Curated annotation (Swiss-Prot):
Positions with a binding annotation for NAD(+): R12, I13, D34, K78, T120, N314
Domain of life, source organism: Bacteria
List of catalytic residues: C150
Entry GO CC: cytoplasm
Gene name tied to this protein: gapA
InterPro entries, per the entry: GlycerAld/Erythrose_P_DH, GlycerAld_3-P_DH_AS, GlycerAld_3-P_DH_cat, GlycerAld_3-P_DH_NAD(P)-bd, Glyceraldehyde-3-P_DH_1, NAD(P)-bd_dom_sf
Protein's UniProt name: Glyceraldehyde-3-phosphate dehydrogenase
């Protein structure tokens, strides 16, 4: 079965997941909706400062995108209800504008003819969140779902492994996060987040994040046990989670590493990675794993208290799991 998808919003995540979708034989992108001119959409897809040039032939013909001879419909429509997904027999819409984050607004895609909707970020209401490595097995056919955030996708698989083996009592997370498109290049007005308005190239910026709390939604056993903060740093891509955690079952740091390594090779293969190399952030650029445990970067204070470090490409890794969720919802 070929899954026909439409992408609403062709920003960083929209473009990265489009690239990844080209490598999946069972997924076909048949439509893109964005307010940009089609020629500019083609340009932004072709050239990427972080991930390099797009490897396939791109052209624009009659306001449609042509990739290796295959036509992709381009529209510039603000109201999702007018997108006419039914005319293209769309199975799943990927909602990546960051604007339609409630059931009522996302449901407009259903009214337009889409069968399912996957939101690329945490919702603003009770839209269920599904994270690979945490709760994909709980999906029951819901029409509108969220893939949570990139940080939740990093933290949840690691937290599940630790909780399953050692029993998490409580934990604090810090994500050291690469800059994103919502930040300001130089100091600019930001009424809701004063610090967030400061220049992204000049500063390490403390920020709030709901990623750790969201883990409790996809892993109910951890509800109320985790919270966290973020620091935005002047890098283009790749972020890292620092999970400082207290657990019930005594274990040395080496024993924890062994458990994570085994999980990365078995149950969590393709989701959770493991490395003992002397790595830095750019070494993870382009990695589709959503959480890569860095054994040499962490440590423990005693047998019940440890600091665990896990890297993630906040664009590629996350986009890869969005497509995994698309496959899940399309087949149920």
């Amino acid at each position: 079965m070929t899954i026909k998808i439409g992408i609403n919003g062709f920003g960083r995540i929209g473009r990265v997941l489009f690239r990844l979708a080209q490598e999946r034989e069972n997924i076909e992108v048949v439509a893109i909706n964005d307010l940009l001119d089609p020629k500019y959409i083609a340009y932004m897809l072709k050239y990427d400062s972080t991930h390099g040039n797009f490897k396939k032939d791109i052209e624009v013909k009659n306001n449609n995108l042509i990739i290796n001879g295959k036509k992709i419909r381009i529209t510039s429509i603000k109201d999702p209800e007018k997108l006419m997904w039914d005319k293209l027999l769309i199975d799943v819409v990927i909602e990546s504008t960051g604007l339609f984050l409630t059931k009522d607004t996302a449901y407009k895609h259903i009214l337009s003819g889409a069968k399912k909707v996957v939101i690329t970020g945490p919702s603003k209401d009770d839209i269920p969140m599904f994270v690979r490595g945490a709760n994909f097995d709980k999906y029951k056919g819901e029409k509108i779902v969220s893939n949570a955030s990139c940080t939740t996708n990093c933290l949840a698989p690691l937290s599940k492994v630790i909780d399953d083996h050692f029993g998490i009592i409580e934990g604090l997370m810090t994500t050291v996060h690469a800059s994103t498109a919502t930040q300001k290049i130089v100091d600019s007005a930001s009424k809701k987040d004063w610090r967030g308005g400061r220049g992204a190239l000049q500063n390490i910026i403390p920020s709030s994040t709901g990623a750790a709390v969201a883990v409790g939604k996809v892993l109910p056993n951890l509800n109320g046990k985790l919270t966290g903060i973020a620091f935005r740093v002047p890098t283009a891509n790749v972020s890292v989670v620092d999970l400082t955690v207290r657990y019930k079952k005594t274990a040395t740091y080496n024993e924890i590493c062994e458990v994570v390594k085994n999980a990365s090779e078995q149950k969590m293969k393709g989701i959770l990675g493991y490395t003992e190399d002397e790595v830095v952030s750019t070494d993870f650029n382009g990695k589709e794993l959503t959480s890569i445990f860095d054994a040499k970067a962490g440590l423990s204070l005693n047998k019940n208290f440890a600091k665990l470090i896990s890297w993630y490409d906040n664009e590629t890794g996350y986009s890869s799991k969005v497509l995994d969720l698309v496959e899940l919802v399309a087949l149920k």
